[in-house]
Amino acid sequence: MRTFYLICTVVLLQIQCNSQPEFNNENRVTAIMINPEITFQTIDNFGASDAWSCQYAGSWPDEQKNRVADLLFSLEENADGSLKGIGLSGWRFNIGAGSADQKGETKINDPWRRTECFLQPDGTYNWEKQAGQRWFLQAAKQRGVECFVGFVNSPPVWLTKNGRANSDGGNSMNLPKENLAKFSSFLVEVTKNIQQKEGILFNYLSPVNEPQWDWKDGQEGSPWTNLEIAELCRQLGNDLQKSGLSTKISITDAGQLNHLYDRGNDANRGFQIREFFSKQSENYLGNIPEVAHKIAGHSYFTTTNDKVLSEVRTKLSNEIEKVDPELEFWMSEYCILGDNDGFKGNGRDLGMETALFVANVIHTDLTVANACAWQWWLAVSPYDFKDGLVYIDKSETGGNIYDSKLLWALGNYSRFIRPGAKRISAEVQENPDLKISAFRNENGDLVVVIVNRNKNDKNIQIELPGNLKHVATIYETSESSSLLKKKNINLNESLNIPNQCIWTIVITS
């Protein structure tokens, strides 16, 4: 899905974390070449999910929950010129399965990981449920978010095989086959009600989440085989068509990216690009109009180092090119899990180490896997893990709010690369340690993001076509700044790129 356009100009660079950029004559200058004629994927959104804390944070006092919403969604500036938030353009709404409504054994020890459900045991609907999450839906809409995804971890507990929101094991769905149509009907009813009550139509429904895992306990979830996913999507596609809703079905939110192109832990739950988008497959879904022409996967456990990052995403891109070059890829969920060459997921980190690690993942997902969307896992977290953008006290009534450098690092992308932007060519010679990507927004603005994880500064020379003079605004995230604005930067001069920080350079059309 690569197209080529002529683009006015593009730039790249990086920066001094604590000072205005300045040239250092003692270091060799690295040339950065821009080819404005080459474009790649179109960006749809940068987002996050409301699981699980928004059900509580959405009931906090107005001042506190609006502060959280501003950090996530706002495109405005404060009176002093600082940015209120990171301007997320996508929001995933967790359609709950009802484990919070159960009095019996849920196998989910943490109440904050349980969810309410609109569907009740008697088959009626209670549209007062999930009120906190619905508040954040409205907050996102009011601040300009346009892409909304309703995603499901488990079918409603009243429909499942075992009466729980997680599985007894095995690779098959925790849903009797005779309830498949009821589950599909539930998703359509929820989508219709959210549209009627909130004025928000889900752009996408994601009916299964990480189907490769067995989901025995700890949180809501269900395994699904590829055959079961295909059967569900055919039923749901038919029901959406009858309803008149324009919502599309998004698949498959794979638990790891390699499950999209190889067998993973189970051949019946792997090879999902060819399974669903190769015309030779029995599970082909490309002929169902209600199925979005995209494949979604999660970057978990494939981010150990640059070698693994690149290899996995190259294989993913190659598989798409082989099966269906027009197929989009969305990276629809990520946080730091497991041990990544000693960089572990446990232990909250509000500083730059985690921010730079994740920025490197974002860069690779965008430039190697050609991701059209990039979405973080927990927008709001109460936990001692590297899983949140905004952290809060684990309280149902209110508490402290903590922003993170990770929040602002994602903002180096999300706040400035807007829906409809094209990624454009940006190449750097002799300095692969600098992670540089460039984009052109629909309004003509050029956006360049540069990640410098090194402990050393770098000098760069930006090579642009023609003899035009370029002045830009730079936004810096470092240990001491959070999208700090630096105006009137002359891009025709060599610049000193500082260590361990992220710059976004915006060149106004």
Language model features with spans:
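Structural recognition of the beta-strand scaffold that forms the well-ordered cores
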Residues: 44-50, 89-95, 99, 147-151, ...
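C-terminal beta-strand-rich structural cap/linker in extracellular carbohydrate-active enzymes
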Residues: 486-509
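N-terminal catalytic cores of secreted or lumenal carbohydrate-active enzymes
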Residues: 26-202, 217-230, 234, 238
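Bacterial Sec-dependent N-terminal signal peptides
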Residues: 1-25
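Aromatic/acidic polysaccharide-binding cleft in carbohydrate-active enzymes
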Residues: 328-412, 424-429
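Solvent-exposed beta-hairpin/edge-strand motifs
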Residues: 465-482
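Noncatalytic carbohydrate-binding groove/subsite architecture in carbohydrate-active enzymes
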Residues: 192, 222-361, 368
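Carbohydrate-binding surface patches
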Residues: 429-468, 500
